[in-house]
Amino acid sequence: MALQETIEQTVTGLGYELVEIERTGGGLLRVTIDMPYVSGAEQFINAEDCEKVTRQLQFVLEVEGADYSRLEVSSPGIDRPLRNEKDFERFAGELVDITLKAPIGVAASAGSAVSANRKKFRGTLERAAPKDGVAGWQIVWSDEPPVKPGQKVSKKKLPAPLQALGFTLDEIHQARLAPVVDFKGRKPKIVPGADKSSEK
């Protein structure tokens, strides 16, 4: 059995989701795990989860005779990679960084302030209308710089218009959650249509 399959079966068998497997120089085998997605529940990987998976993988990889010198099991962190449709569904509405396989081109940038050579974007991930029967996504952003603490903003100044770029998963080279650090605490994710009477 291939190493990828062995690791995936072991991780999912323990009740976790395999996010990424990486082999680096020096024989390091890095395995990234996460909690399976459950709508409405926000769960996080902790040290005990990583330890549990590490112990099981060490046993399984020894039995399989896998060639590695060090094993590292960790959570995906604040810049979690988005790899498949399920990941995009899970993190819709979140701030993401995407890199396209090819620049958007002159046709796509016509009539907008976006450069035709641009491949990298940061914005809010949203579901879009399907294109040719393929599930569509879009990223929405504003090129207005963020307001700095203590900075005064004129009430007369018009905000920069929102821009959107539609894409399919086949056009993505890399997508990750944007690492946003807020030391004032985690803000609850606003769900459209949620019952506002329960908020007090």
UniProtKB/Swiss-Prot annotation:
Cellular compartments per GO CC: cytosol
Name of the protein: Ribosome maturation factor RimP
GO BP annotations listed: ribosomal small subunit assembly; translation
NCBIfam families for the chain: PRK00092.2-1, PRK14642.1
Domain of life: Bacteria
Function noted in UniProt: Required for maturation of 30S ribosomal subunits.
Pfam families linked: RimP_N
Keywords (A to Z) from UniProt: Cytoplasm, Ribosome biogenesis
Regions that span the bilayer: none
Alphabetized InterPro entries for the sequence: Ribosome_maturation_RimP (IPR003728), RimP_C (IPR028998), RimP_C_sf (IPR036847), RimP_N (IPR028989), RimP_N_sf (IPR035956)
This protein's encoding gene: rimP
Major subcellular location class: cytoplasm
The keyword Repeat belongs to this UniProt entry's keyword annotation: no
Family named by the database record: Belongs to the RimP family.
Localization per Swiss-Prot or TrEMBL: Cytoplasm
